[in-house]
Amino acid sequence: MIHFTHNDLDALGCMLCVNTKYNNISKTYHTYYGDFSEQVQNILNDNDEHVMITDLCFGDHKDDLIKLIENKKAVILFDHHSYPKDFFTDLDTKPNFRRFINTTHCASTECFSKFKIDNDNLKFLIRMINIYDTWKQNDELFYNAQRLNKWFWTKNISELSEYLIKNDYCLPSNYLPSAQKIVDDDLEKMSEIEKTCLKQCGCVSFVFSHTCFNDIVIQQHKYRQAFVIGIYNNIYKVRVNQSWDFSENDLNELRMKVMGQIYGHPYAFTYKHEGDLTEECKRLGILLNNFVQEHSFLPF
């Protein structure tokens, strides 16, 4: 069976669950979304007829999902991203396709739950991943989860997955000092990034750098900024402050206004825009500030 997944911390959790549950994974394909269709084509060229998909949003790639369903014997999707209401209507009739989508937690939590894995170490690790991936900023382990994510990006995901499975899902003995050093180093970089790469427009903060982005999001949210938008290589990462009283309908309306579609995480969604940077930032600044004013939102 092929495993097709993302390349982030939640994808690592999915790999741990999938590789623990199944011993017949022939190959794992990762995508960072920039090569999404290319990786789908690689999977289509692979002789393995069974595909497990985890932590991938097909909102912009429905044609790719259709190709997989039409050309493989079995396709199973575990995901946590939001989709338009009728997105799966035609696909759910396909006998070789099944999906398990739960937007209340991360994809690795869904895998862990559905696979009924009984291991306390993995359970705790999945909890940490869920806290980070769904941005539970009021959880007591939120900053520990942030540190785990920083450390994760210094590792090879396949090698790390293999190591954790072999070591009963325990992090290396040097994890804490090495991860804390990464945190401390990033904090030293923040002041310079704030001076050169951070611009505020009303309740919106724009960050023109991917370095220390999450740290800046946390800080700006503490300052009661409603939105923080990271922009790098035509990718726009929108992070919504959960301390503001946005309802589910508000968040759906917001994503529709920003992206023209309702998919992705309601508080943390990403889209690509290859048009003029200045014009897009101007559009977002006006749109989001007007959105807050029109609805008379207030931060808690």
Predicted regions mapped to residue ranges:
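Anionic-ligand anchoring segments at beta-strand to alpha-helix junctions in alpha/beta enzyme folds, i.e.
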Residues: 1-44
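Divalent metal-coordination and catalytic microenvironments
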Residues: 8, 18, 55, 79, ...
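Gly/His-enriched, cation/cofactor- and phosphate-binding structural elements
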Residues: 49-50, 180-300
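Short gly/pro/ser/thr-enriched loop/turn and capping motifs at secondary-structure boundaries
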Residues: 11, 82-86, 108
